[in-house]
Amino acid sequence: VEQKEETPETIRVLLTTTDFAEKEHDEVKVRSEKPFVVKAGESEKRCEGGEELCIRAVDMSAETITIHSAEEAKLEITSIKRGERIPSYRGTLELKKNGKKIRIINELPLEQYLYGVLPSEMPAEYPEAALRAQAVCARSYAEKQKQNNRLKEYDAQVDDSVAYQVYQSQPEDERANKAVDDTKGLVVCSGNILASTYFFATSCGVTTSSDSVLFTNKEISYLAGQVQSTDISD
């Protein structure tokens, strides 16, 4: 495990539709408890707290619209549902017109992104050590995906679904946020190379080696198959 340099690093997250069904939206509805600012080209509009803004691709006067809170409050996208809840986002929302559809990119500090990942990937009531380990794993995974840049056609680095790491499926949690803060900047490396920290929710107790599942002939030494055993004699 290594400590990354202190830099104000950000990540760009492509937000999918309800049920993570599609990468592009028919319309986008945004609101916030506090005032927020909408910028389209040279024009700028201020929306009051509680006001809902509805944007459709056909109505967009610019190819890109950016939305940010005037008071660093979270932005809710009411046109998206995650389970029974409406997700809320830190940072900036960037809406990009693509024909009759809209792409939504949430740009925010990477550490704050992890606040939205941890409780979506691991129950926040798990032990502190487990949450800290997951925070390091999630940070390393995000950094690796930024390097891979597989979503460059969307001008994003990850999306919010299981294709990457689930993000904002569950609300932020104080315990999970603390685990992120306690491990700030820590990533997993193999030698001087950032490691690929794949993880999964369900296991039968046996993992397999990387060359069997990652569609590559290159063996990754630290991703070797293991039998996971637990002593339950006590």
Model region roles, listed by residue range:
Residues 1-234:
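Conserved, single-site charged/polar hotspot
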